[in-house]
C-alpha cells in the first residue's frame, strides 16, 4: 500500500507527542485510547487545522504547503459534534460539500445509505443530534468519495459513531469499507475497542499524547497494552469465531 501521509516527531505543547507514523492508501486506521489521550488533537493536526512541532508529509508534500482549497479537494475532515453554523435545507448543505454538484444521484445514494431520505428538505437547525451527525457524515463522504472526486485521498473522522444507533453505525461501516476498497485512506478515533478489533486494519494506541503501540489491530489491542493505557485489566475472548475484549474486575 502506498503511503498517503507521513508523520515525523509531531508534537503540540504538552498535549501531543512527539510521535511518528504513516497512513496508507486503502486502509482504515483507528486512533484509540482514554479521554485526553490526544486523539482529537492529532486528527486536527493531520487535517491541517493546527500547527506545531514536527513534520507531516501529505501526498509527498509538506502539509503546510497545501492551500485550503486544494487540501479540501484531497482530504475531508469531520471534527467532533458541533451545532449547525446556520439554517439551510439539508440537501443544500450536502450540495455545498460536493465538488461535482451535478451528481444528484450520488447525493441521494449517500443520503439513503444513512437513512436521510426524508430529511433532505428539513432545515439543519431542526435536526436531532443523531440526524445532524449523519448529515455531517454524508457531507464529508460526498466531499471525498472517489466516485465523484478522483483526487480524494484521505478521510479523517473524529468519533464518527457518536449519536448513531447500531443500525446507523453498521451503515457507516459499510460506507467506509467501500471507500477503503476504492483506495481511500481513513483515519478515525474510536472509544469502542471491539469495533476497532472488528473493523480497523491498523490501530494507534495513545495515552497522554504518547503512542503506546502501533501496528495491526491484533498486535495493538492486547490485554497488556490496554491495561497500560486504561489502568484496568482486559481479557480477549474468541466467541463463535469472533474476537472480543472484555474488562475484568
Curated annotation (Swiss-Prot):
| A Pfam family that the UniProt record links to this protein | ABC_tran
One MF term in GO for this entry? ATP binding
Subcellular location, record wording = Cell inner membrane
Query: What is one GO cellular-component annotation here?
Result: plasma membrane
Q: Which Gene3D superfamilies match?
A: P-loop containing nucleotide triphosphate hydrolases
Its predominant location is membrane
Q: How does it sit in the membrane?
A: Peripheral membrane protein
Task: Write down the EC number.
Answer: 7.6.2.8
Q: Which UniProt keywords apply?
A: ATP-binding, Cell inner membrane, Cell membrane, Membrane, Nucleotide-binding, Translocase, Transport
Which amino acids does the record list as binding ATP? 33-40
Q: Does the keyword Magnesium apply?
A: no
ABC transporter domain boundaries: 1-233
**Key word Magnesium present:** no
Catalytic activity annotation: an R-cob(III)alamin(out) + ATP + H2O = an R-cob(III)alamin(in) + ADP + phosphate + H(+)
Q: Which family does it belong to?
A: Belongs to the ABC transporter superfamily. Vitamin B12 importer (TC 3.A.1.13.1) family.
Q: What does the subunit section of this Swiss-Prot or TrEMBL entry state?
A: The complex is composed of two ATP-binding proteins (BtuD), two transmembrane proteins (BtuC) and a solute-binding protein (BtuF).
Q: Which PANTHER family match?
A: METAL TRANSPORT SYSTEM ATP-BINDING PROTEIN TM_0124-RELATED, VITAMIN B12 IMPORT ATP-BINDING PROTEIN BTUD
Main function: Part of the ABC transporter complex BtuCDF involved in vitamin B12 import. Responsible for energy coupling to the transport system.
Q: What's the protein called, per UniProt?
A: Vitamin B12 import ATP-binding protein BtuD
- Organism of provenance: Escherichia coli O1:K1 / APEC
Q: What is the lineage of its organism?
A: Bacteria, Pseudomonadati, Pseudomonadota, Gammaproteobacteria, Enterobacterales
Amino acid at each position: 500500500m502506498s503511503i498517503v501521509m507521513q508523520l515525523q516527531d509531531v508534537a503540540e505543547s504538552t498535549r501531543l507527542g512527539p510521535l511518528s507514523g504513516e497512513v496508507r492508501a486503502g486502509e482504515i486506521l483507528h486512533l484509540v485510547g482514554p479521554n485526553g489521550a490526544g486523539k482529537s488533537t492529532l486528527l486536527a493536526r493531520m487535517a491541517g487545522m493546527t500547527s506545531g512541532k514536527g513534520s507531516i508529509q501529505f501526498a509527498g508534500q509538506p502539509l503546510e504547503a497545501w492551500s485550503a482549497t486544494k487540501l479540501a479537494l484531497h482530504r475531508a475532515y469531520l471534527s467532533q459534534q458541533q451545532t449547525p453554523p446556520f439554517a439551510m435545507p439539508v440537501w443544500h448543505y450536502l450540495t455545498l460539500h460536493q465538488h461535482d454538484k451535478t451528481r444528484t444521484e450520488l447525493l441521494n445514494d449517500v443520503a439513503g445509505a444513512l437513512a436521510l431520505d426524508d430529511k433532505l428538505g428539513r432545515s439543519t437547525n431542526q435536526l436531532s443530534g443523531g440526524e445532524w451527525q449523519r448529515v455531517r457524515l454524508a457531507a464529508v463522504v460526498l466531499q471525498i468519495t472517489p466516485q465523484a472526486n478522483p483526487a480524494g485521498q484521505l478521510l479523517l473522522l473524529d468519533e464518527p459513531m457518536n449519536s448513531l444507533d447500531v443500525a446507523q453505525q453498521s451503515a457507516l461501516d459499510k460506507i467506509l469499507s467501500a471507500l477503503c476498497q476504492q483506495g481511500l485512506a481513513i483515519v478515525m478515533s474510536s472509544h469502542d475497542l471491539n469495533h476497532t478489533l472488528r473493523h480497523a486494519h491498523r490501530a494507534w494506541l495513545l495515552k497522554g499524547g504518547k503512542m503506546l503501540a502501533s501496528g495491526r489491530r491484533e498486535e495493538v489491542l492486547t490485554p497488556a497494552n490496554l491495561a497500560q493505557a486504561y489502568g484496568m485489566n482486559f481479557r480477549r475472548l474468541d466467541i463463535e469465531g469472533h474476537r472480543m475484549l472484555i474488562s475484568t474486575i
